Amino acid sequence: MALSKEDILTWLEEAKTSEVVELITAIEEKFGVTAAAVAVAAGSGPASVDAEEQTEFDVMLMSFGDSKINVIKEVRAVTGLGLGEAKALVEAAPKAIKEGVSKADAEDIKKKLEAVGAKVEIK
């Protein structure tokens, strides 16, 4: 009697972990393969690109809160913009303050802006 792929998958869903481990060990011995090599090969396709951790972040000023002047000063310090440009950026919230920065830099900028009363999100 031949088992169908569906029968095998059903058994795997219902089997105990120890039974699955025994099956994997038997397959490794019988066919001279290792499960680690199969796992690496399965994860090396285009689907693994989606699983990668995000490396670039955008710092978004959602609102300037009660202390607009202090937020403008901090935006100037973080971005290097002039007074008028920083003021326009703050007044245009929600707006990106910095784009494509590392996670550490984004967290640092967020902390500085929140310290002066701004509402900030990292995307």
From Swiss-Prot:
Matching SUPFAM superfamilies: ClpS-like (SSF54736), Ribosomal protein L7/12, oligomerisation (N-terminal) domain (SSF48300)
CDD domains named among the record's database cross-references: Ribosomal_L7_L12
Listed GO MF terms: mRNA binding; structural constituent of ribosome
Keywords linked to the UniProt accession: Ribonucleoprotein, Ribosomal protein
Gene3D superfamilies: 3.30.1390.10, Single helix bin
Lineage top rank: taxon: Bacteria
A GO CC term assigned to this protein in UniProt: cytosolic large ribosomal subunit
One BP annotation, GO: translation
One Pfam family from the record: Ribosomal_L12_N
InterPro entries, A to Z: Ribosomal_bL12, Ribosomal_bL12_C, Ribosomal_bL12_C/ClpS-like, Ribosomal_bL12_oligo, Ribosomal_bL12_oligo_N_sf
Summary of subunit composition and partner proteins: Homodimer. Part of the ribosomal stalk of the 50S ribosomal subunit. Forms a multimeric L10(L12)X complex, where L10 forms an elongated spine to which 2 to 4 L12 dimers bind in a sequential fashion. Binds GTP-bound translation factors.
Function comment: Forms part of the ribosomal stalk which helps the ribosome interact with GTP-bound translation factors. Is thus essential for accurate translation.
PANTHER family: 39S RIBOSOMAL PROTEIN L12, LARGE RIBOSOMAL SUBUNIT PROTEIN BL12M
Family to which this protein belongs: Belongs to the bacterial ribosomal protein bL12 family.
Protein name listed in UniProt: Large ribosomal subunit protein bL12
Organism, as annotated: Borrelia turicatae (strain 91E135)
Gene responsible for this protein: rplL
